């Protein structure tokens, strides 16, 4: 019998999407080192719409603990400055013309532990998303088998493949989390 209409590559793509979202979220966590991705979640009210910071300015890292934001439009400097202040990143920009300089302060141990907890929360959300994709895949397989388009042997084989993909993706999430945790806790 055929394996019906089951697309394993789509399932893996959806699982990798959860990993991608996790990496984006973890990239926004401040680790004590300057990173241009730290400012990625910030949006600015510009030209009548909300725009990401990287569409109104260039973010660079001139030093290990310094971010430089070069705003392209002089009229947008105050809006960018306000958005950075209001972003809950704990950063206070120093404005010099169209350039905003952001000193990244040292993190104390308590704040590092809080960031680790946030990272764990993000990772758990990614794992839940992967498990949802797994459940959707398994439900689809069972439906295809129930409709008679797949043999029970094919169901077992594909179920194992789905579980293997799930396990690999969760291992990747754990590895990504461990890497970020190490980065956060390193002084």
UniProtKB/Swiss-Prot annotation:
Tagged with keyword Magnesium: no
Keywords tagged on the record: Cytoplasm, Protein biosynthesis
GO annotation, biological process: cytoplasmic translational termination
GO terms, molecular function: ribosomal large subunit binding
Domain of life per record: Bacteria
Protein family per UniProt: Belongs to the RRF family.
Name of the featured protein: Ribosome-recycling factor
Lineage: Bacteria, Pseudomonadati, Pseudomonadota, Alphaproteobacteria, Hyphomicrobiales
Gene symbol of the encoding locus: frr
